[in-house]
Amino acid sequence: MLCPPDVAFEKRHFKRRDGNKVVPPSIALVAGLESGFLFKLSAVEDVARRGQFPGLLTEDGFLLMCEESEHIRDAYAMAKHLVALAPDGIFTRATLQEAAGKVGSTQDTLSVEEVDALFNALDSDNRGYVSVDEFMDALYGEEGREAMREIRREYMRRKIEVEGEPSWRMRPTPKPTRKLRQKRKREQGQKRKQGQRQKQEQGQRQKREQGQRQKQEQGQKRKRERGGAQRPPPPKQKAGCGC
């Protein structure tokens, strides 16, 4: 969520050797965003130039800028600003450098060193990019995420008004042509014939196997019968003498 200006300054400052807390102008831009203020670089540099330590902002100088600036409490307004800065949804060093080059006044153009400092302050996890959604979530919570979704929906509505409906929505599912229907019909007929042929071959194979089994059984039966006819009769027992 948005934090008070003094908390944002405390989070981003560094200490000089004399113990004074300061921030460079590029980091003051980040602290301003985190507390709900959009500063112009030229205005920040002007305050830093006239401050106690030329080129740096003290806490008093930063808080004074916040008091004199309009606070962006509306998540929707902040989302519009960030979408204009990063339309693809992420900040990279190149994104910030390009955005700095597009600023109308040359006074507000960030140098390469300032872009690096600004990006390093935003990319605290060293991932190489900063998600706009994550940034809005950190500032406004669910309200920030919903604002980003609304901005994107509005962008799509405007794009459709200019370019028309996306082609994947406009183009209906094509109906099969006569040639395609005939092709499908031939394929289905071939599948049916193939199935009938396989069924017929299976029946013939089963019939042959059954005939062979019957033939084997009959041969074994005849063999057993012939063996029984050729066996000699058992010998007769002689009558006893009665002694």
UniProtKB/Swiss-Prot annotation:
Main location: cytoplasm
Any one Gene Ontology cellular component term annotated for this protein: microtubule
Compositional bias of kind Basic and acidic residues: 198-220
Keyword check for Cytoplasm: yes
Keywords: Cytoplasm, Cytoskeleton, Microtubule, Repeat
Residue span(s) of domain EF-hand: 110-145
Location of the region described as 6 X 8 AA tandem repeats in the Swiss-Prot/TrEMBL record: 181-228
Location(s), subcellular: Cytoplasm, Cytoskeleton
Pfam families to which the protein is assigned, alphabetical: EF-hand_8
GO molecular function: calcium ion binding
Nuclease listed as a keyword: no
Start and end residues of each stretch annotated as Disordered: 166-243
InterPro entries given in the database record: EF-hand-dom_pair, EF_hand_dom
Residue stretches of biased makeup (Basic residues): 176-196
Extent of the Sequence repeats: 181-188, 189-196, 197-204, 205-212, 213-220, 221-228
The protein's role, per its UniProt record: Microtubule-associated protein that may be involved in cross-linking microtubules.
Stated name of the protein: I/6 autoantigen
Protein species of origin: Trypanosoma brucei brucei
Lineage: Eukaryota, Discoba, Euglenozoa, Kinetoplastea, Metakinetoplastina
